[in-house]
Amino acid sequence: MIKLFNTLSKRVEVFKPIDDVVKIYCCGVTVYDLCHLGHARSYIVWDILRRFLIYSDFKVKYVQNFTDIDDKILKRAKEESSSMKEVSEKNIIEFHKDMDSLGIMRPDSMPKATNHICNICSFITILEDKGYAYSRDGDVYYSVFKNKNYGKLSNQNIQEQNINQQGRMANDENSKKLNPQDFALWKKAKDDEPFFDSPWGKGRPGWHIECSAMVKDELGDTIDIHLGGSDLIFPHHENEIAQSEAANGKKLANYWLHNGMVNVNGQKMSKSLKNFTTIRELIKSGISPMSLRYFVMTVNYRKPLDFTEEALRSASEAWKNINIALSFMDLTKGAFRYIDKNESIEEEYKEKISFELSQKKLKFSEALGNDLNTAGAIAIIYDLAKPLKNFLNQFQRVEGFKIDLNEKFFLIENFKTLEKLTKVLGLEKEVLVKESKITEEEISSLINERLKAKKGKNYAKADEIRNLLNEKGIELIDQSKEITTWIRL
């Protein structure tokens, strides 16, 4: 059973899909710049939701759009002396690079607003025909007061709304509107702007109508889950509901899920406040992609995530331990690849281990099924990683270490379970997560120096070299007194 907090009902509800395929729409980025940690949090969280649904045997169709026409894109194009298309296409490529680096599965479909202009115009025409929209000198607006249910998602009282709280609309447009709260469906083109032809003349779509049209075209009138950041609840998602339900006469989405913001010094991380850190900058600073992913999972997805160097370092250390456990097969040099046919293990012991691991998998599913409790899921991951890490400490440092057959079976099955469950969280083993300034030749030289120190019983010097290499992202593995291997962390 999967339970999710529905922003629409303001309570946790049991998830019941409409049909065999779970239809999900996630609001995508406006492609005018590189993505920051706030974007990373949102798309990591929803990637985990998608992965967990698939793990739970649901079929999923996941759609995420690109807003590729917008005031910010036009402004950036002017700054760079380029076109709107050049700016958006360049940043779409960079978006994919960032998301791929974080292990985020690509959506099944990623529609662009500019490819749906005909659908958008048709959608606006329906709203006009039904009396929900009106045109003024080439602009088209949605009449908020025509919709008695407006405000049901955000609990906004339209009588009390601030006139300036209109998303991406300029104040000088208010004079064209019947009411200050009405919002733009179509914007008349300015002399120096790119435009599209429409029944109302040359112009471009408003922000909110783009998503309504793309949801309908990609997934139909009613979808299972609509996703986004909590900053989109109003006005964007509220306006989506108003548009779609007025035009289609059906509920837009059964479940509305929103992730909390990333905060810096108590303020939302955003480009407008200039307090953001891009994903690229974080990774370049030495934070591995999986450490970043792990960091996002440490806090409930609906709560604010406080961005501090200390929290990132703590997440990196925690992930390092899990990553070592995920490297178990590599570090044991194939000794645990399989159980030989001639090696006999009691069925009673096999059943015991199988039951214990099935209980861990059950608790893992219960955690994620409880409104994506990633912290609870991580606790299970730690339970699985601990015996593998403990064994490696012995295996790497004790010469001639012998492996008990039952323990071998347990560790193999434990590793398989760990590998399976970390994939649900999108956590993948990292061999090289950051560039190291130390070369392989330098590593080998220091290892030889350390071996000489150990032979001379200069253990302080040996520890000093180990610590030095560890600071440079190198983990030493003592296979015997004379053989030491290493991995990059």
Swiss-Prot record:
Entry GO MF terms: ATP binding; cysteine-tRNA ligase activity; zinc ion binding
Its protein name is Cysteine--tRNA ligase
Keyword terms: Aminoacyl-tRNA synthetase, ATP-binding, Cytoplasm, Ligase, Metal-binding, Nucleotide-binding, Protein biosynthesis, Zinc
Native source species: Prochlorococcus marinus (strain MIT 9215)
**Which InterPro entries does the record cross-reference, listed alphabetically?**
Cys-tRNA-ligase (IPR015803), Cys-tRNA-synt_Ia_DALR (IPR015273), Cys-tRNA/MSH_ligase (IPR024909), Rossmann-like_a/b/a_fold (IPR014729), tRNA-synt_1_cat_dom (IPR032678), tRNAsynth_Ia_anticodon-bd (IPR009080)
Cofactor section: Zn(2+)
According to its UniProt entry, one GO biological process term is: cysteinyl-tRNA aminoacylation
Q: Does the keyword Ribonucleoprotein apply?
A: no
